[in-house]
């Protein structure tokens, strides 16, 4: 069994994925982490990398192929990613939604924790986070419609 977890930024995907993986004693694969690593290799923030992806499909290709391969070769795992359900269609799909203001509060609180660097922006206020979430959502939506027709 494969469980894919998707949802709006700040909806608790990572929290739920970690809890499920721990409870089931299954591995957890985090696609957001792979995208952040790829952005870092190019000297970009995740926001810049996502923006680049609107005109360069290669920014998604590595993670997309990785997800497909996982779905074909492995079983009994949790995968967390905005498009994981699409690339592993036989997975059990969980979608988490959240009010945008609540999402911004969750993310802002997370960024305030001691060990979390604000890697993507200089997000100093809740309003900055709300704006960042909206920009990310629109960028992701554009890429997903353009490249995956979803």
PLM features: what roles do these ranges have?
Residues 89-114, 122-125, 132:
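Conserved phosphate-donor/acceptor-positioning beta-strand/loop module used by diverse small-molecule
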């Amino acid at each position: 069994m494969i469980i894919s977890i998707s949802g709006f930024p700040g909806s608790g995907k990572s929290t739920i994925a970690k809890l499920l993986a721990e409870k089931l004693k299954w591995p957890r694969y985090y696609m957001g982490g792979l995208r952040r690593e790829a952005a870092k290799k190019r000297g970009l923030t995740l926001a810049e990398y996502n923006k680049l992806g609107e005109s360069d499909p290669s920014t998604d290709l590595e993670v997309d192929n990785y997800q497909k391969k996982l779905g074909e070769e492995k079983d009994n795992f949790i995968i967390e990613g905005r498009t994981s359900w699409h690339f592993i269609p036989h997975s059990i799909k969980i979608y988490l939604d959240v009010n945008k203001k609540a999402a911004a509060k969750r993310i802002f609180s997370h960024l305030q924790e001691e060990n979390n660097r604000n890697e993507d922006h200089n997000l100093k206020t809740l309003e900055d986070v709300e704006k960042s979430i909206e920009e990310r959502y629109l960028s992701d939506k554009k890429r997903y419609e353009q490249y995956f027709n979803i």
